[in-house]
């Protein structure tokens, strides 16, 4: 999860407060001091933290609370409210509309990941049914057009740029005009990365904006910038009308609080966060679910949406039907793994209540992906009868040896995969799938109860030899 360390510290502070028998002034102050330290060490500006602490003390006046009030709940609600206030500028960003051309211009410092973010933004909207296109107006950085071209080709997004033209304004105008004629409804213009001191580059950025008349200017910010974020964002806002912000590299930097809070202070809403290098590691930033995850409360609606997003509708219906009848075959597991590989593990677990990304061992996600791919290779060497049989007893010695030879794996690895299938099948068969296919009613209470509640889920995560077990279960759950 983004800001894993901060989220873990806040969650632990809440748990410690909940373990105290009586909530008095000392307990409240200790709790607020721990939250304050956590926020400051994550680069949230001192002024914002001090204001938040003052507001919480006004809301939670222990002397005025009657004996029957749930003080813990009131404190948690106050923390939630103030964190939301800190991160929400109070105004929505421009949203592109289909069948109407919208021009979105990307600006940012050098090295913030702007070009990659342009492609992620286009890819996200393309999946939503938009006809997106990319224009490379970055003539300053060597290899900029090559990078955009490579990214766009991989994502199957049309693009425009030039190896010979050096005027970024001309390229931007030509690209926008071309894609408007081609009836694209989302045209994204990538500009040169700048330094705050580079006045000429800022003038170039202003000229591109003036010539293309973008509907939205997005400022791309590196999460590691810390408390310098406010100053940098102000420099860009003074040159062009920044309407929204995307924060990148939130997967690898514990101190992303400065970027989040300082950008919110400039009154430009954060609309997306980049959580990894892959094209799908790009999350919509919604303040309330984000704060809920930060406080360890999870985000069930986000989890269900994410699972349903990566699972084709026909496959959802097929698996719901099979699971409702108690059928979980190797083919079901194969389909499950395919979908699971599309969801980064850190995103998945950050949406579970009581779970912190700190609980995920470093490198565990990649290890699980490798193991899933290895198992899928073995299943590729199976017959249709073997894949569709709900009875693992059909795998005798000769079948196992044939699968091992066909997949280039060891016999013991095939046997390990079959044992894994039995474990996951047992878990999946214990989950009651409604025949109407409403997956939002599947995950929360029932699954947690079958795992022994939240404490059982946390214990399972700590003891797991492979995070794939959980990934498999939730991949199937979403289907």
Curated annotation (Swiss-Prot):
Its EC number is 3.6.5.4. Residues 296-479 are annotated as: M-domain. InterPro entries: AAA+_ATPase, P-loop_NTPase, Signal_recog_part_SRP54_M_sf, Signal_recog_particl_SRP54_hlx, Signal_recog_particle_SRP54_M, SRP/SRP_N, SRP54, SRP54_euk. Residues 1-295 are annotated as: G-domain. Keywords: Cytoplasm, Endoplasmic reticulum, GTP-binding, Hydrolase, Nucleotide-binding, Ribonucleoprotein, RNA-binding, Signal recognition particle. It is found in: Cytoplasm; Endoplasmic reticulum. SMART domains: AAA, SRP54, SRP54_N. It catalyses: GTP + H2O = GDP + phosphate + H(+). GO terms for biological process: SRP-dependent cotranslational protein targeting to membrane. GTP binds at residues 108-115, 190-194, 248-251. GO terms for cellular component: cytoplasm; endoplasmic reticulum; signal recognition particle, endoplasmic reticulum targeting. It is an enzyme of class 3 (hydrolase). Its main location: cytoplasm. It comes from the Eukaryota. One of its GO terms (molecular function) is 7S RNA binding. Pfam families: SRP54, SRP54_N, SRP_SPB. The NG domain, also named G domain, is a special guanosine triphosphatase (GTPase) domain, which binds GTP and forms a guanosine 5'-triphosphate (GTP)-dependent complex with a homologous NG domain in the SRP receptor subunit SRPRA. The two NG domains undergo cooperative rearrangements upon their assembly, which culminate in the reciprocal activation of the GTPase activity of one another. SRP receptor compaction upon binding with cargo-loaded SRP and GTPase rearrangement drive SRP-mediated cotranslational protein translocation into the ER. The M domain binds the 7SL RNA in presence of SRP19 and binds the signal sequence of presecretory proteins. Component of a signal recognition particle (SRP) complex that consists of a 7SL RNA molecule of 300 nucleotides and six protein subunits: SRP72, SRP68, SRP54, SRP19, SRP14 and SRP9. Component of the signal recognition particle (SRP) complex, a ribonucleoprotein complex that mediates the cotranslational targeting of secretory and membrane proteins to the endoplasmic reticulum (ER). As part of the SRP complex, associates with the SRP receptor (SR) component SRPRA to target secretory proteins to the endoplasmic reticulum membrane. Binds to the signal sequence of presecretory proteins when they emerge from the ribosomes. Displays basal GTPase activity, and stimulates reciprocal GTPase activation of the SR subunit SRPRA. Belongs to the GTP-binding SRP family. SRP54 subfamily. HAMAP family: SRP54 (MF_00306). This is Signal recognition particle subunit SRP54 1. It comes from Arabidopsis thaliana.
């Amino acid at each position: 999860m983004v800001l894993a360390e901060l989220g873990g510290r806040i969650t632990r502070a809440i748990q410690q407060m909940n373990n105290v028998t009586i909530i008095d002034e000392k307990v409240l102050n200790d709790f607020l001091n721990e939250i304050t330290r956590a926020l400051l060490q994550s680069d949230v500006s001192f002024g914002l933290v001090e204001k938040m602490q003052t507001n919480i003390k006004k809301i939670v006046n222990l002397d005025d609370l009657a004996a029957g009030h749930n003080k813990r709940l009131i404190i948690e609600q106050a923390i939630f409210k103030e964190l939301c206030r800190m991160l929400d500028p109070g105004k929505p960003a421009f949203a592109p509309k289909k069948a109407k051309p919208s021009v979105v211009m990307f600006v940012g410092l050098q090295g913030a990941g702007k070009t990659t973010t342009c492609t992620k933004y286009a890819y996200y909207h393309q999946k939503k049914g938009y006809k997106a296109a990319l224009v490379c107006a970055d003539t300053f950085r060597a290899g900029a057009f090559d990078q955009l071209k490579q990214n766009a080709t991989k994502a199957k997004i049309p693009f425009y740029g030039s190896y010979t033209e050096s005027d970024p304004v001309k390229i931007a105008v030509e690209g926008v005009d071309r894609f408007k004629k081609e009836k694209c409804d989302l045209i994204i213009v990538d500009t040169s990365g700048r330094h705050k001191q580079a006045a000429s580059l800022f003038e170039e950025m202003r000229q591109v904006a003036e010539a293309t008349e973008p509907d939205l200017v997005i400022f791309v910010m590196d999460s590691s910038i810390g408390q310098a974020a406010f100053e940098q964002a102000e420099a860009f806002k003074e040159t062009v009308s920044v309407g929204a912000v995307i924060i990148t590299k939130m997967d690898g930097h514990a101190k992303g609080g400065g970027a989040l809070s300082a950008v919110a202070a400039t009154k430009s809403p954060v609309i997306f966060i980049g959580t990894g290098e892959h094209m799908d590691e790009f999350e919509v930033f919604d303040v309330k679910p984000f704060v809920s995850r930060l406080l360890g409360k999870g985000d069930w609606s986000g989890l269900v949406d994410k699972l349903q997003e990566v699972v084709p509708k026909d496959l959802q219906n097929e698996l719901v039907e099979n699971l409702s009848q108690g059928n979980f075959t190797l083919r079901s597991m194969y389909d499950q793994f395919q979908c699971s590989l599309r969801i980064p593990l850190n995103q998945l677990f950050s949406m579970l209540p009581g779970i912190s990304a700190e609980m995920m061992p470093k490198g565990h996600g990649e290890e699980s992906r490798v193991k899933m791919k290895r198992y899928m290779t073995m299943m590729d060497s199976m017959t249709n009868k073997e894949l569709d049989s709900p009875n693992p007893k059909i795998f005798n010695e000769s079948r196992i040896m044939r699968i091992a030879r066909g997949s280039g794996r060891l016999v013991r690895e095939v046997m390990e995969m079959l044992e894994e299938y039995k474990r996951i099948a047992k878990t999946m068969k214990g989950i009651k799938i409604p025949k109407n296919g409403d997956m939002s009613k599947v995950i929360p209470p029932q699954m947690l109860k079958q795992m022994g509640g939240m404490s059982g889920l946390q214990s399972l995560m700590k003891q797991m030899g492979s995070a794939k077990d959980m990934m498999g279960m939730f991949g199937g759950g979403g289907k």
